[in-house]
Swiss-Prot record:
Annotated ATP-grasp domain residues: 9-245
PANTHER family (UniProt xref): SUCCINATE--COA LIGASE [GDP-FORMING] SUBUNIT BETA, MITOCHONDRIAL (PTHR11815:SF10), SUCCINYL-COA SYNTHETASE BETA CHAIN (PTHR11815)
PROSITE patterns: ATP_GRASP, SUCCINYL_COA_LIG_3
Organism for this UniProt entry: Coxiella burnetii (strain CbuG_Q212)
Protein name per Swiss-Prot or TrEMBL: Succinate--CoA ligase [ADP-forming] subunit beta
Reactions that this protein is recorded to catalyse: succinate + ATP + CoA = succinyl-CoA + ADP + phosphate; GTP + succinate + CoA = succinyl-CoA + GDP + phosphate
One GO location term (cellular component): succinate-CoA ligase complex
Record note on cofactor: Binds 1 Mg(2+) ion per subunit.
Length: 390
């Protein structure tokens, strides 16, 4: 789950991490009130969307008076902001962050992520603040400093100092402030079950202070059951509606750009299915894992989600029956196809417990359901069917 910038900064303040004074607003008049509360005669207006690249897309604006402020907020609210991280439809702007300006002398990058290889939290820092860290990693990986956290003892102050001096910084007052910030970020990361945390940029002001000018936070979805405060911060308007619907039924769904819908039980089998579709000359329209218990209800909802994508011209169902019998899965598929009213070809490959009986039920159903003879045959059949339609 992703948080908006204003929500992320709200969390940072709870951990005594310095951020600029700011207010989130939902209309132009509230923006004027927010500016009066913040003070000053210039402000930064930031569109709140779950995507990077806002500045280049016109979603971050510097305003020099309250008339410009109202005009900027009015222009941004309600629009769909298109950045390099969104699709062509963009993300809806429903909130605006009005923030005090900062006297920026230097921009740094600071982030933390769970490294799957080492199974540990890794903190990263770079002198290349204010730009996409992915570009830095690609072009100048030597400019990214890393420290790995031992989970038995946690992040240590000496590791913060390693990053500080590695950035070419020397001031002892700044070192203490930097250490406090990084240690606070570590507590935030572990206590709130984060999977990604980025401060980009972390700025050094003209007076030598360190301030977190922007913040990005991703939360581990699997831990939301114990993070009730964060769970309430979810903004479903920023998420794909298909993925939101899938989460309600505990289905793992990711939309792709192809035209062959996939329904599979098991993430590994789902990825192998997508690979085989691609190898056979097709393009998968989604990743969809119905999980180990492919009940009739979940299969029905999975079909509804798949066919709600207008690009889908055919569906491949690939189920391995272990504990769940394939004949019962076949009953669920037939019932779901009838209920949803699917008018595109459906190819089903069943393997495992009672697979032959399940295939017979599909063949005898009288519906537009093709029982495949094997894994490769299933991929070839659906690609062929979609090719005929195209």
């Amino acid at each position: 789950m992703n948080l908006h910038e204003y929500q992320s900064k709200h969390l940072l303040k709870k951990y005594n991490i310095p951020v600029p004074a700011s207010e989130v607003v939902f209309n132009p008049d509230a923006a004027v009130d927010a500016a009066a509360k913040i003070g000053g005669d210039r402000w930064v207006v930031k569109a709140q969307v779950h995507a990077g690249g806002r500045g280049k897309a016109g979603g971050v604006r510097l305003v020099k008076n309250k008339e410009e402020l109202k005009s900027a907020v009015k222009a941004l609210l309600g629009m769909r902001l298109v950045t390099y991280q969104t699709d062509e439809r963009g993300q809806p702007v429903n909130q605006i962050l009005v923030e005090q300006t900062s006297d920026i002398a230097r921009e740094l990058y600071l982030g933390a992520v769970i490294d799957r290889a080492s199974q540990r939290i890794v903190f990263m820092a770079s002198t290349e603040g204010g730009v996409e860290i992915e570009k830095v990693a690609e072009k100048s990986p030597e400019k990214i400093l890393k420290v790995t956290v031992d989970p038995a003892i946690g992040l240590q102050p000496f590791q913060c100092r390693q990053l500080f001096f590695g950035l070419g910084l020397q001031d002892l007052k700044q070192m203490r402030s930097f250490t406090d910030i990084v240690m606070g970020l570590y507590r935030l990361f572990t206590e709130r079950d984060l999977s990604l945390l980025e401060i980009n940029p972390l700025v050094i002001t003209g007076s030598g202070e360190l301030i977190c000018l922007d913040a990005k936070i991703n939360i581990d979805d699997s831990a939301l059951y114990r993070q009730s405060e964060l769970r309430e911060m979810r903004d479903t308007t920023q998420e794909d509606e298909h993925e939101t619907m899938a989460q309600q039924w505990e289905l793992n769904y990711i939309k792709l750009d192809g035209n062959i819908g996939c329904m599979v039980n098991g993430a590994g089998l789902a990825m192998a299915t997508m690979d085989l579709i691609k190898l056979s000359g097709g393009d998968p329209a989604n990743f969809l894992d119905v999980g180990g218990s492919a009940t009739k209800e979940r299969v029905t909802e999975a079909f509804k989600i798949i066919v709600s994508d207008k690009n889908v011209k055919g569906i491949l169902v690939n189920i391995f029956g272990g504990i769940v019998r394939c004949d019962l899965i076949a009953d669920g598929i037939i019932s779901a196809v009838k209920e949803v009213g699917i008018d595109v070809p459906v190819v089903v490959r069943l393997e495992g417990n009672n697979a032959q009986l399940g295939a017979k039920k599909l063949a005898d159903s009288g519906m537009n359901i093709i029982a495949a003879k094997g894994f490769a045959d299933a991929a070839e059949q659906i690609v062929k069917q979609v090719g005929v339609i195209a």
